[in-house]
């Protein structure tokens, strides 16, 4: 704490001295520029700015594919402000260190897209040109935290700031220009995984068809796969306006369970909550003229469900149990869902059609 107060005092002293000198710039970032320059001096940052005016503190070159302006970057990162306060992160260790770890939350690399206007200018300046496997720690001044693109630092300095200065510590895990195919390929790798368990069986053993390993080409429709786990008691399709009851468990491709109606499963995966009722949920079986399954809803309040979940149900018959695996366009797309499902995440749902609860 003393070091922080001392640093702030030194910065204030430098700013006071600078106020007597001729102003280097004018405009909305005049004070920001003076403060930033003073902060660099107090913290002995002696590196020269590069690109638009970012300061690269550490850099390890990757050996994989180069990040360009037309794709999707999978990366781990930690961001902090100039005072050292962590403002965002992807890693589980950081969450644990901050006392913010939640078992059901997702921790790991996340996708951002690199298209023009989707990244802050300074962040894009740091990321574009990096290669998969590369690492960089960089300081990005507040005037470069803008989604607009200009040709020079002076043009950014003339704009109103949108965000404070940022220290960005990033590692590139992967890069693709074809995100849907990337997800489908990930599903294919999941089918062949020997370590992830599906109801106590390795995924590689579950996803077999007549003794042959399921492949990405075995989709029922693009990005959607279904595997029967228990045969139905009747192969007749459900009539319209039918109500059925199911138990389900939702997972990501790494085997992490994020939601379930089964109490034992919740406890086994350490996501149990005493505030939640673990019991079969009602499914309202209906259809629409356009896609057949779009009218399926959940609960007495007819809650809408994601397409992949509905499409899994659409494959099923009375008392059947099965597993649906699908890419994010049939799930939560680029936005993900809360803290448990990241953007561009394929999902797995194990669904068990059961008898109506007696109560």
Regions found by a protein language model. Give the residues of each.
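Sec-dependent bacterial lipoprotein signal peptides
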Residues: 1-20
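Cross-family detector of peptidyl-prolyl cis-trans isomerase
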Residues: 5, 20-359
């Amino acid at each position: 704490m003393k070091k922080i107060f001392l640093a702030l005092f030194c910065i204030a002293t430098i700013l006071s001295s600078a106020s007597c000198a001729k102003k280097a710039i004018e405009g909305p970032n005049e004070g920001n520029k003076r403060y930033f320059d003073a902060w660099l001096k107090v913290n002995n940052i002696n590196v020269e700015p590069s690109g638009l005016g970012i300061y690269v503190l550490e850099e390890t070159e990757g050996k994989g594919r180069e990040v360009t302006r037309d794709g999707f970057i999978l990366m781990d990162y930690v961001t902090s402000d100039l005072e050292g306060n962590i403002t965002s992160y992807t890693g589980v260790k950081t969450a644990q260190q901050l006392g913010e770890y939640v078992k059901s939350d997702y921790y790991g690399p996340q996708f951002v897209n690199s298209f023009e206007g989707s990244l802050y200018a300074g962040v894009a300046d740091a990321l574009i040109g990096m290669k998969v496997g590369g690492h960089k720690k960089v300081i990005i001044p507040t005037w470069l935290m803008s989604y607009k693109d200009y040709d020079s630092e002076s043009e950014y300095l003339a704009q109103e700031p949108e965000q404070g200065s940022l220290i960005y510590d990033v590692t590139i895990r992967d890069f693709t220009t074809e995100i849907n195919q990337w997800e489908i390929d990930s599903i294919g790798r999941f089918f062949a995984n020997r370590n992830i368990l599906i109801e106590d069986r390795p995924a590689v053993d579950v996803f077999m068809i007549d003794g042959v390993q399921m492949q990405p080409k075995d989709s029922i429709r693009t990005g959607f796969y279904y595997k029967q786990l228990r045969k139905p008691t009747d192969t007749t399709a459900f009539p319209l306006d039918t109500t059925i009851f199911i138990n389900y468990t939702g997972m990501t491709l790494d085997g992490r369970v994020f939601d379930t109606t089964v109490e034992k499963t919740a406890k086994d995966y350490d996501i149990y909550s005493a505030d939640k009722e673990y019991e079969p949920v009602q499914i309202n079986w209906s259809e629409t003229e356009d896609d057949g399954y779009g009218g399926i809803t959940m609960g007495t309040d007819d809650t809408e469900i994601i397409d992949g979940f509905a499409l899994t149900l659409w494959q099923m018959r009375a008392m059947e149990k099965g597993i649906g695996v699908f890419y994010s366009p049939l799930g939560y797309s680029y936005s993900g869902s809360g803290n448990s499902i990241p953007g561009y995440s394929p999902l797995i749902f194990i669904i068990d059609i059961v008898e109506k609860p007696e109560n």
